[in-house]
């Protein structure tokens, strides 16, 4: 089953609107055809309007980095998935380890968000990943499998087939440590196996699984050569236009 790769940059809490616009203008005309790869950037909420506007005539897709699971209401400081859709966003990243860790998001929250994102016609990029402690204890597969099952509970097979799963070992995010090619393949396959167990092999063959965690132009080819790695969710290397474009060289 040929799955189209997806490379997504996660800017985290970086860039003001002017910097976001300059970045999009620098990369937009240089991106490969959408027949080959989907390319997205996840911009901070304060940059979304500018980023979406700057990207609108290009193949670059735009993701929000989070949303709430209600469309409107007394939820001070939250972002409405309905409004994200109206603004023209394509994806929403949910379940990132920084959200789970610093903002105490639970698997149940992430599941509710996934449902709300689909209800508004957007596509979730659902993150999962284990700590160094869990990894060293040999419990990564079990831990990440439980995260994935919980995040996808109650979604339809069609929804699951269309979403993106991003496996990011927490010990490799922004640490300069990256998972080996074997680690990435084994864990992305484990994620796909959970989808197969919960939704059937046909759905598992369609769902795209990204690897994230210190991905850079120098190692992206190795990860993309893995049969179960369909893309990358990239932090630091997505902040500069040149390094972001260099991530796409794996196509050559």
UniProtKB/Swiss-Prot annotation:
Superkingdom of origin organism: Bacteria
Binding site for substrate: 10-12, 174, 214, 235-236
Keywords recorded for this protein, A-Z: Cytoplasm, Gluconeogenesis, Glycolysis, Isomerase
PROSITE patterns assigned: TIM_1, TIM_2
Active site: 96, 168
GO molecular function: triose-phosphate isomerase activity
Cellular component terms per the entry's GO annotation: cytosol
Localisation: Cytoplasm
Catalytic activity: D-glyceraldehyde 3-phosphate = dihydroxyacetone phosphate
A Pfam cross-reference name: TIM
Pathway: Carbohydrate biosynthesis; gluconeogenesis; Carbohydrate degradation; glycolysis; D-glyceraldehyde 3-phosphate from glycerone phosphate: step 1/1
Any one GO biological process: gluconeogenesis
Primary location recorded for the protein, binned into one broad class: cytoplasm
Enzyme Commission code: 5.3.1.1
Assembly mode: Homodimer.
Family, similarity comment: Belongs to the triosephosphate isomerase family.
Function: Involved in the gluconeogenesis. Catalyzes stereospecifically the conversion of dihydroxyacetone phosphate (DHAP) to D-glyceraldehyde-3-phosphate (G3P).
Name of the protein this chain belongs to: Triosephosphate isomerase
Annotated source species: Streptococcus pyogenes serotype M4 (strain MGAS10750)
């Amino acid at each position: 089953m040929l799955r189209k790769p997806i490379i997504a940059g996660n800017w985290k809490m970086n860039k003001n609107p002017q910097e976001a616009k300059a970045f999009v203008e620098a990369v937009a005309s240089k991106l490969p055809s959408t027949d080959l790869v989907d390319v997205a950037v996840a911009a901070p909420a304060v940059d979304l309007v500018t980023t979406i506007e700057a990207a609108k005539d290009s193949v670059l897709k735009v993701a929000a980095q989070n949303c709430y699971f209600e469309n409107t209401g007394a939820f001070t400081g939250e972002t409405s998935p309905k409004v994200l859709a109206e603004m023209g966003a394509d994806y929403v990243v949910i379940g990132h380890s920084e959200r789970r860790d610093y903002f105490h998001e639970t698997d149940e929250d992430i599941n509710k968000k996934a449902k709300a994102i689909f209800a508004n016609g957007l596509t979730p990029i659902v993150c999962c990943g284990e700590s160094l402690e869990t990894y060293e204890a040999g419990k990564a597969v079990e831990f990440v499998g439980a995260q994935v099952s919980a995040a996808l509970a109650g979604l339809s097979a069609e929804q699951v087939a269309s979403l993106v799963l991003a496996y990011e070992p927490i010990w490799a995010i922004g640490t300069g440590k990256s998972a080996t090619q074997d680690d990435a393949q084994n864990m992305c396959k484990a994620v796909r196996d959970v989808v197969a167990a919960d939704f059937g092999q046909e759905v598992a063959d369609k769902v795209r699984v990204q690897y994230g965690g210190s991905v850079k132009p120098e190692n992206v080819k190795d990860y993309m050569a893995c049969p179960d790695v369909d893309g990358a969710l990239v932090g630091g290397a997505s902040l500069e236009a040149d390094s972001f474009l260099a991530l796409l060289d794996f196509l050559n």
